[in-house]
A protein has these predicted regions:
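N-terminal secretory signal peptides and thylakoid transit peptides that target proteins
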Residues: 1-17
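A short beta-loop-beta micro-motif enriched in histidine and acidic residues
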Residues: 115-117, 128-141
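Double-stranded beta-helix
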Residues: 203, 207-255
Length: 255
């Protein structure tokens, strides 16, 4: 998550929309983990090394011309749901050493990174959130570990021929208008997953309602190219675009 000034500009602009109340279910126990990958039974979870080994094998397939991204995402979902992350030593260490260092922003720990994919732990205080942003040429799976969050996914519907300029922190930005289509809105609870692909639901936001911890897998990993191409959106979710269900007008900034 680089390009902090652009992100903060959009985040500040989005505060007008962040006050919308959300009703989320309280959580008392962890959900049971599904064990669907390769016929495993319910008590045969993966350890950390096995988890990485299987994703490493799967992620290599992204360079094949007939790579099925949807099938890959489903396999990663199944792997994540076989993992008891709080029992992994590296995750235990991150949990134990947690400090809320970044006011109004989540804490990020990189659990594993290679060119083909990365695994991260994100920890949120109540009130911290990630506003709408995309992941160019990437696909990803979020796995909720503790807490709960409202997750919204969008796809770019069309660009609009409408721009304006605005200044923030001494820098002038051009705001470009577009229309986004909501593809999914869900409340994630422990053991549940949310997905995005490079072509569907690639723009998402995440708003926890309590202290929340999640693990995500992104393929390929973040690099200078996809970081530079990432866009942060301000979405007007109050009104449907042209009164069409699931369509919303949005703006994004170019410096």
């Amino acid at each position: 998550m680089e390009h902090n000034e652009r992100r903060e500009f959009i985040k500040m602009s989005a505060l007008a929309f962040a006050g919308i109340a959300i009703q989320l279910n309280s959580i008392s126990t962890f959900a049971q983990h599904a064990n669907l990958f390769q016929g495993r039974t319910i008590n045969q979870g993966l350890n950390w090394d096995a988890f990485l080994s299987k994703i490493t094998q799967l992620a290599k397939e992204q360079y094949q011309p007939n790579w099925d991204q949807n099938s890959y995402i489903k396999n990663v979902q199944n792997l994540l749901q076989q993992c008891q992350f709080p029992e992994f030593e590296n995750v235990k260490k991150e949990f134990a050493s947690y400090e809320n260092k970044n006011k109004d922003w989540f804490e990020h720990a990189l659990l594993h990174k290679e060119i083909n994919f990365q695994v991260s732990l994100l920890q949120f205080e109540k009130g911290e959130y990630i506003s709408h942003h995309n992941h160019p040429d990437m696909c990803g799976v979020i796995n909720m570990v503790t807490g709960n969050a409202l997750v919204k996914n969008y796809s770019l519907h069309k660009e609009l021929e409408k721009t304006k300029t605005q200044s923030y922190n001494g820098q002038t930005y051009t705001l470009i208008s577009c229309v986004l289509e909501e593809t999914k809105k869900e409340i994630l609870t422990p053991g549940k997953t949310s997905i995005l692909t490079s072509t569907k639901g690639n723009i998402h936001s995440l708003m926890p309602n309590e202290f929340t911890q999640l693990v995500d897998v992104f393929t390929p990993s973040y690099n200078e190219k996809n970081e530079a191409a990432s866009i942060w959106y301000q979405v007007n979710e109050e009104v449907n675009f042209e009164n069409k269900s699931k369509l919303f007008e949005a703006e994004y900034a170019l410096s």
